[in-house]
Design a protein with these regions (language model features):
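Carbohydrate-active catalytic/glycan-binding domains of CAZyme proteins
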Residues: 20-170
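Bacterial N-terminal signal peptides that target proteins for export
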Residues: 1-6
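Bacterial N-terminal signal peptides
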Residues: 7-16
Length: 170
């Protein structure tokens, strides 16, 4: 009888602990917008390294390094620089073939892209440290995007950004 009472008490204590943990657990989605005109950091609760933003009218478009991951060059849209949504990927399925590098790659491929809007077209330029400077373009941020084009074959280049001169040349 005493043994059964001890087992019942232990079972009650152990079960109460599990129930307390279950009732306290709340899974929340991160929201930076406080709903009162303020926000809390981080605005983007994810790894969007080397972000670049361009403004077209009242809209903001962001892209960031995607390295060797696919879909690559995700495009995010915002009206207020706080609330962002993914609207497309400029490199959805494949990157250009890689020539064998002289040494191992460490997260290369798409580094520090630059997104710009010029003469009704969106352009994204990025550097691949082993191959050179690539570019994709689209008339709409939602896509479809062109296939990546190797603009300049060169090693060791990252953090590219286009500038258009008065003649319209990049």
């Amino acid at each position: 009888m005493k043994k059964q009472w001890i087992i019942a008490c232990l079972a009650g204590v152990l079960t109460a602990g599990v129930q307390a943990q279950q009732s306290n657990y709340v899974s929340e989605v991160w929201v930076a917008d406080q709903g009162n005109g303020t926000y809390k950091n981080p605005v983007l609760y994810a790894d969007y390294s080397d972000p670049d933003v361009c403004r077209v009218g009242d809209d903001f478009y962001l892209t960031s390094s995607s390295f060797g991951c696919l879909p690559g060059l995700q495009i995010l849209h915002s009206k207020d620089l706080v609330n962002w949504s993914i609207i497309s990927a400029a490199v959805p399925a494949a990157l250009p073939p890689v020539t064998t590098p002289e040494r191992p790659e460490h997260g290369n491929r798409v580094w520090a892209p630059s997104i710009r809007h010029h003469n009704g077209e969106f352009y994204i330029f990025w550097g691949d440290p082993d191959q050179g400077i690539f570019m994709v373009k689209s008339s709409r941020a939602e896509g479809p995007w062109s296939k990546p084009v190797l603009v300049k074959e060169i090693k060791g280049i990252i953090d590219t950004c286009p500038i258009w001169d008065e003649d319209g040349k990049v």
